[in-house]
Amino acid sequence: MVTKILKAPDGSPSDVERIKKESDYLRGTLKEVMLDRISAGIPDDDNRLMKHHGSYLQDDRDLRNERQKQKLEPAYQFMLRVRMPGGVSTPEQWLVMDDLSQKYGNGTLKLTTRETFQMHGILKWNMKKTIQTIHSALLDTIAACGDVNRNVMCASNPYQSEIHSEVYEWSKKLSDDLLPRTRAYHEIWLDEERVAGTPEEEVEPMYGPLYLPRKFKIGIAVPPSNDIDVFSQDLGFIAIVEDGKLIGFNVAIGGGMGMTHGDTATYPQLAKVIGFCRPEQMYDVAEKTITIQRDYGNRSVRKNARFKYTVDRLGLENVKEELENRLGWSLEEAKPYHFDHNGDRYGWVEGIEDKWHFTLFVEGGRITDYDDYKLMTGLREIAKVHTGEFRLTANQNLMIANVSSDKKEEISALIEQYGLTDGKHYSALRRSSMACVALPTCGLAMAEAERYLPTLLDKIEEIIDENGLRDQEITIRMTGCPNGCARHALGEIGFIGKAPGKYNMYLGAAFDGSRLSKMYRENIGEADILSELRILLSRYAKEREEGEHFGDFVIRAGIIKATTDGTNFHD
């Protein structure tokens, strides 16, 4: 029985709430405006709705000033994100995405930090053809963005293949069961005829006509690997395995990475474990958690609208009590678990049933051909002969998974022929790096990330080598803005773009993803970054204890205070 009456924040709904309310369940005027050839863009109201269909309108910011001088509209283009729970793609689907990127995109694919594909550079008049082709490959872009449950993540851990297979099936079921029920996507992109007369309450029984106050993210981790950063999720499930069998999941609620520069009422937060559920109870837990956010989330101030703020405002125990009240049963006590890292394991790993997995290092998650490295071509050739699957990891890398023994030699030869790398000749720091897209396509970016981090790493590696730390894993993450797509606050070294060439520098996150970082220096450029890291890494090399990770060292050495909760992130 709930002992405290919960309520949503007071305040007038934001304009986005108006747009959703008037959208006729995410239809708006998208069908009409996508036929318009006068402009390559679309009205803002429709762009807000477009997210729920898996796409954002962007423009090439490298060209923005020049086009303004020429009195031309911005170089509008669309980013399209695929819904692909668990990050698993068949070779046939890989080839379709490769082909679409060449025909309609910018010739590259982005492997995201949520285990899916992003295509950039799609023109408005090519969007429908692109989505229809994706649909023909048994994929879709429904709810890949927007105020709904996003792509459900799942551990890619090759060491527990039998558990991965089972957990992956649960991630797919969860993703499908939590989809919006509106037929808007099918009508606009797939030419489905609208069926009239459906009662409103039947259209979206879980989401309702306003959907959620903000995005909602779910991920499933399989200890000891926290590769999906389970504590960064709105709702995290931690697989509990006993005697080689999956018995259920610990449930964690209230995580999220985004914040706003200069606003201490916004902050990253880690999800807290509140109990345990059996696999067959997972959907019920997810659905009821989502309805709590639907009913009590902040619909007035979008920067405070994520579920983490709802949990912090209402109180963890009150939210747990409300969840159990809606479930009609109580969560079991959480089971013991242990994480020891949140990175990937590179190279060949033997799985079960005579299958092998090869994890490829993909810097920045960008699949393209370089002058001296034909990454995209090599993967295309592998996809033509591969009989297993591809797994996109949460660290923007790629696993060529379930390679049969009789195919291993052929796949190995192609890896060798195209020089595809497991990254082991790079520093462990580079292999533990992650960056969001940022410029030139992201409209929120304040500074470079993906295009700049490799160059910065070249210079940091000189310091690493000087101090004998080349094989020391240190997680380093860079984002072009504070929204946190590359989960900057969980990097032992983190950078958030503040202005062109300027970053806030963060230290002190845990190597296993269980502690947030804290700001160390504000608004600094490359020279200061390198100067600070030279001092810090030198001290780490000399003063660290046996097995001590960098994020732990800077706290023990008094260099930075530990962030014990997101609410003291700014302290």
Swiss-Prot record:
<keyword id="KW-0521">NADP</keyword>
<comment type="pathway">
    <text>Sulfur metabolism; hydrogen sulfide biosynthesis; hydrogen sulfide from sulfite (NADPH route): step 1/1.</text>
</comment>
<keyword id="KW-0411">Iron-sulfur</keyword>
<dbReference type="InterPro" id="IPR045854">
    <property type="entry name" value="NO2/SO3_Rdtase_4Fe4S_sf"/>
</dbReference>
<dbReference type="GO" id="GO:0051539">
    <property type="term" value="F:4 iron, 4 sulfur cluster binding"/>
</dbReference>
<dbReference type="GO" id="GO:0046872">
    <property type="term" value="F:metal ion binding"/>
</dbReference>
<feature type="binding site">
    <location>
        <position position="442"/>
    </location>
    <ligand>
        <name>[4Fe-4S] cluster</name>
    </ligand>
</feature>
<keyword id="KW-0560">Oxidoreductase</keyword>
<feature type="binding site">
    <location>
        <position position="485"/>
    </location>
    <ligand>
        <name>[4Fe-4S] cluster</name>
    </ligand>
</feature>
<dbReference type="InterPro" id="IPR006066">
    <property type="entry name" value="NO2/SO3_Rdtase_FeS/sirohaem_BS"/>
</dbReference>
<dbReference type="InterPro" id="IPR006067">
    <property type="entry name" value="NO2/SO3_Rdtase_4Fe4S_dom"/>
</dbReference>
<keyword id="KW-0349">Heme</keyword>
<dbReference type="InterPro" id="IPR005117">
    <property type="entry name" value="NiRdtase/SiRdtase_haem-b_fer"/>
</dbReference>
<keyword id="KW-0408">Iron</keyword>
<feature type="binding site">
    <location>
        <position position="481"/>
    </location>
    <ligand>
        <name>[4Fe-4S] cluster</name>
    </ligand>
</feature>
<keyword id="KW-0004">4Fe-4S</keyword>
<comment type="similarity">
    <text>Belongs to the nitrite and sulfite reductase 4Fe-4S domain family.</text>
</comment>
<comment type="subunit">
    <text>Alpha(8)-beta(8). The alpha component is a flavoprotein, the beta component is a hemoprotein.</text>
</comment>
<keyword id="KW-0198">Cysteine biosynthesis</keyword>
<dbReference type="GO" id="GO:0020037">
    <property type="term" value="F:heme binding"/>
</dbReference>
<protein>
    <recommendedName>
        <fullName>Sulfite reductase [NADPH] hemoprotein beta-component</fullName>
        <ecNumber>1.8.1.2</ecNumber>
    </recommendedName>
</protein>
<keyword id="KW-0479">Metal-binding</keyword>
<comment type="function">
    <text>Component of the sulfite reductase complex that catalyzes the 6-electron reduction of sulfite to sulfide. This is one of several activities required for the biosynthesis of L-cysteine from sulfate.</text>
</comment>
<dbReference type="GO" id="GO:0019344">
    <property type="term" value="P:cysteine biosynthetic process"/>
</dbReference>
<dbReference type="Pfam" id="PF01077">
    <property type="entry name" value="NIR_SIR"/>
</dbReference>
<dbReference type="InterPro" id="IPR011786">
    <property type="entry name" value="CysI"/>
</dbReference>
<dbReference type="GO" id="GO:0009337">
    <property type="term" value="C:sulfite reductase complex (NADPH)"/>
</dbReference>
<keyword id="KW-0028">Amino-acid biosynthesis</keyword>
<feature type="binding site" description="axial binding residue">
    <location>
        <position position="485"/>
    </location>
    <ligand>
        <name>siroheme</name>
    </ligand>
</feature>
<dbReference type="InterPro" id="IPR045169">
    <property type="entry name" value="NO2/SO3_Rdtase_4Fe4S_prot"/>
</dbReference>
<dbReference type="GO" id="GO:0050661">
    <property type="term" value="F:NADP binding"/>
</dbReference>
<dbReference type="Pfam" id="PF03460">
    <property type="entry name" value="NIR_SIR_ferr"/>
</dbReference>
<dbReference type="GO" id="GO:0000103">
    <property type="term" value="P:sulfate assimilation"/>
</dbReference>
<dbReference type="InterPro" id="IPR036136">
    <property type="entry name" value="Nit/Sulf_reduc_fer-like_dom_sf"/>
</dbReference>
<feature type="binding site">
    <location>
        <position position="436"/>
    </location>
    <ligand>
        <name>[4Fe-4S] cluster</name>
    </ligand>
</feature>
<dbReference type="GO" id="GO:0070814">
    <property type="term" value="P:hydrogen sulfide biosynthetic process"/>
</dbReference>
<dbReference type="GO" id="GO:0004783">
    <property type="term" value="F:sulfite reductase (NADPH) activity"/>
</dbReference>
